[in-house]
Amino acid sequence: MEVFTFRKKIKINLIMEVGTLTMNVNETAEEYIDQIPMWARKKNSLEDIRRFLYEMGEPDESMKIFHVAGTNGKGSVCAFLQSALINTGYRVGTFTSPHLIDIKERFCINGKMVSEDTFFRSCERVKELSQRMMEKGFCHPSYFEFLFYMAMDMFCQAEVDYVILETGLGGRLDTTNVIRHPLVSIITSISLDHTEYLGDTIEKIAWEKAGIIKEGVPVVFDGNDISASAVIKSRAKELLVSFDQVDKQDYRIINTNDIGFCAQFLDTNGKNHELMIPSHGEYQVMNALLSFRALEAAGLGAIKSIKEGFSNMQWPARMEEVMPGVFLDGAHNPAGIEAFLEAALKLCQTRQKKADIMFSAVSDKDYSLMIKKVANTLPLYHVAVAHIDSERGLKTEILLKEFQEVCGSQVKGFSSVEEALSFLLHERDEDRLIFCVGSLYLMGEIKTVLRRNKYDGF
């Protein structure tokens, strides 16, 4: 294996072909990546991305890849697959997005975030690749393209047995769809989100997601939405691909406890299996079942190892109890909010408690509908809203007005997430649960605050 010299500081002498952005400074790798516009004006086509991979030696061609698309549940499916494969004894690379706190969260090897050393070395290699390709007339990679190349590089260097690859946006034109021979294509639940890019109907969005389906590659998909299922099945039949439609009829909840759900699954042969799902959200049962069927489709049916792996699955900000009675859920669209509310309401009813809510959202989401759903579903006591530290974040005044119009509970606005969290933690008592929801940016800020250990003893 080639040995590269590690330099934590990377010399950048590059004029990017994106707007008029010019950089000629010494920066760390993360600073360099952060200055790449997420939505480059000149994005590389899939054919061009293939050329980048060819220049890298086409590392993806020798990888066994699970390719995951969908609106909600992608990250959780990746986490279930990762946990099961690691427990079976395989070395696994996982590429997901977005990150909550640290950009390195997007790259995991055997369930652990890559080291700073690994991250910087890979960034340097991809930066040098980008410079070579620009000299040949290609555009500098977009933010997500750059991270995708880093993932392929890291997983190649780590000599992983399997790769779990989550799409960034959509499927058909997504950067990750450059891969040609995945083991299985997986499509999670589909709902209205990113409509400005993917279309304004379920059918249009499903068509974009179904773009990851490839000839000769089995597809496993969430079949609970009739409209989405029809589109996915049509595409699979067009390509003569075997498909496995999974829905709520394929499992039943046996019991629940403080850890999560015990569910009974049907495998593709109609045989029952009992699995423990460590989550307070029933929506994770469907994600676990999708993962189970995908492993079957890949010929990896070591049931005992899968069961143990699933029972150890961890995925942040999905009905995550970060301290007793305090839950984080990254739901950020109406369908995700509905799944969250189903789980939160069951917790309130089971524990006979009311709910305190911290809510924030970004401006390009259907925040008004999400707020109405929250206000009309949960037995609310306190509602705290705050502006998240993002250009896309809604102003506190807008959030406050929206909640006040539909909610009779005590609604308070705060200038920061930390102030809102501090208020709820100071005011909480044994009769209420605290739920934080509405945006993954919000989850990241809360986790950053909690990391400072300011709230020990509350």
Indicate where each model-derived feature is located:
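Short functional linear segments
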Residues: 4, 13-70, 77-90, 95, ...
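Acidic, Mg2+-coordinating active-site environments of NTP-dependent enzymes
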Residues: 10, 134-136, 158-166, 182-274, ...
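ATP-dependent carboxylate-amine ligase catalytic core
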Residues: 53, 58-61, 87-180, 196-198, ...
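Short, high-confidence coil segments that cap the C-terminus of an alpha-helix
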Residues: 158-161, 352, 429-431
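Nucleotide phosphate-binding/pyrophosphate-handling subdomain across enzymes
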Residues: 162-165, 173-186, 190-194, 204, ...
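Beta-strand->loop->alpha-helix junctions that form or flank phosphate-binding loops
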Residues: 222-223, 237-257, 276-282, 305-313, ...
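C-terminal helical cap/extension that packs against the catalytic core
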Residues: 225-240, 327, 371-433
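Active-site-proximal loop/hinge segments that shape catalytic or ion-binding/gating pockets
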Residues: 439
